[in-house]
Amino acid sequence: EDHPVHNRGEYSVCDSVNVWV
C-alpha cells in the first residue's frame, strides 16, 4: 500500500486501520 503517510513513517489511526484491516 503506497501512502504518503506510510512512506513518511507516520501512521494515522484511520490510515493504519484501513490498511491493516
UniProtKB/Swiss-Prot annotation:
Tissues with expression: Expressed by the venom gland.
Modifications made to the protein after synthesis: Glycosylated.
Record's keyword terms, sorted: Disulfide bond, Glycoprotein, Growth factor, Lipid-binding, Metalloenzyme inhibitor, Metalloprotease inhibitor, Protease inhibitor, Secreted, Toxin
Subunit structure: Homodimer; non-covalently linked.
GO CC entries: extracellular region
Subcellular location, record wording: Secreted
Protein name (record): Venom nerve growth factor Bco12
Family, as annotated: Belongs to the NGF-beta family.
GO molecular function, one term: toxin activity
Role this protein plays: Nerve growth factor is important for the development and maintenance of the sympathetic and sensory nervous systems. It stimulates division and differentiation of sympathetic and embryonic sensory neurons as well as basal forebrain cholinergic neurons in the brain. Its relevance in the snake venom is not clear. However, it has been shown to inhibit metalloproteinase-dependent proteolysis of platelet glycoprotein Ib alpha, suggesting a metalloproteinase inhibition to prevent metalloprotease autodigestion and/or protection against prey proteases.
Highest taxon of the lineage: Eukaryota
Primary residence: secreted
